[in-house]
Amino acid sequence: MSQFFEAATPVAIPTNNTNGGSSDAGSAATGGAPVVGTTAQPTINHRLLLSLKEAAKIIGTKGSTISRIRAANSVKIGISEKVPGCSDRILSCAGNVINVANAIGDIVDVLNKRNPENEDAAEGEAEEHYYFHFLNHILPAPSKDEIRDLQQLEDIGYVRLIVANSHISSIIGKAGATIKSLINKHGVKIVASKDFLPASDERIIEIQGFPGSITNVLIEISEIILSDVDVRFSTERSYFPHLKKSSGEPTSPSTSSNTRIELKIPELYVGAIIGRGMNRIKNLKTFTKTNIVVERKDDDDKDENFRKFIITSKFPKNVKLAESMLLKNLNTEIEKRENYKRKLEAAEVDATVVTERSDSASFLEEKEEPQKNHDNKEEQS
């Protein structure tokens, strides 16, 4: 039986649009309305691999398209700078889980749209073969046998989601159970690349389907990543577009850096600084364009109360910015815990005062009772 692509059905989340979701992503042709959450949602930062043409299309004329997506979904979106000689760029999208998923659904919708004035060029772009093989589709193009409404065939799009290798197994699940469930539930196709992106510990998860369906499956993938208990405070390297060395070995941000700073962060605050699913530290790395490595804690480590953070970049000002932001986050966390501690102490003092007053009142009542009895006896006599 053929796999049918399915239009998205809204997930069990309130759909009154308080964040101004894009109307384009909610059309029937693109697979259903995007979901919008009204309650506080956990935050995530997703990264997509783009070709130069795709990046230009998402940016739009004078940045109009990316600005619209950013404003409509209340997210932070940025695209890495062009690296001479490289055919790829990275899009980062950060915000709460649902808004990020909606924004990426809008991105798929933008990439699906073709220029009616130049259909031949659009066809040529779709069939282009890239030297950087990660840009080539892993999944075959959708066929007429896989869709019930042939008019919607061209509305099927795809994303190349960059995911740390430590999360891939959780997304796939035991014997592929999780990824099969996502495919069947949302009417999409999903596949993980076998190869790692150059000089990194990340792989590509390619998702193919209607924009609305991709939105919904991204929400579940985000939840899997955020709840992944096997998160390692590791030396996992993030991928950045770069050229290879003449020897054939890729140049990674960590090996090409000429500026390096090491910070020791108290172990008590490491979890808060890194954030859930390493989300906070990833956002910091993306914003400052640096590579930040959190060293693993060894059993024989002499500084057992501290963890080493290593910041590297070929731009000294970026390293300094990352250092100042990291220390600011640390000071904020320390101050937050101190304030909480003071509030607890104040509450304990208030409770003690109330108890003392209650004891005093009880003592006075006990003292007044015999006096009343004595007065009553005198009146009777």
UniProtKB/Swiss-Prot annotation:
KW Repeat (keyword) present: yes
GO molecular function: RNA binding
Region (Disordered), start-end ranges: 1-34, 357-381
Domain called KH: residue spans: 43-107, 156-221, 258-326
Main location: cytoplasm
Biological processes, Gene Ontology terms: chromatin organization; mRNA transport; regulation of translation
PTM comment, free text: Phosphorylated by the plasma membrane-Anchored casein kinase YCK1. Phosphorylation at its C-terminus reduces its RNA-binding capacity.
Positions carrying Phosphoserine: S358, S360, S362
InterPro entries, sorted: KH_dom, KH_dom_type_1, KH_dom_type_1_sf
Summary of the function given for this chain in its UniProt record: RNA-binding protein involved in the correct localization of transcripts in the cell. RNA localization is a widespread mechanism for achieving localized protein synthesis. Required for the asymmetric localization to the daughter cell nucleus of the ASH1 transcript, coding for a specific repressor of transcription. Overexpression inhibits translation of the ASH1 transcript. Involved in the stability of transcripts, like the MTL1 mRNA. Involved in structural and functional organization of telomeric chromatin and regulates silencing at the HMR locus.
Subunit-level organization: Binds RNA.
Name under which the protein is recorded: Heterogeneous nuclear rnp K-like protein 2
Gene: HEK2
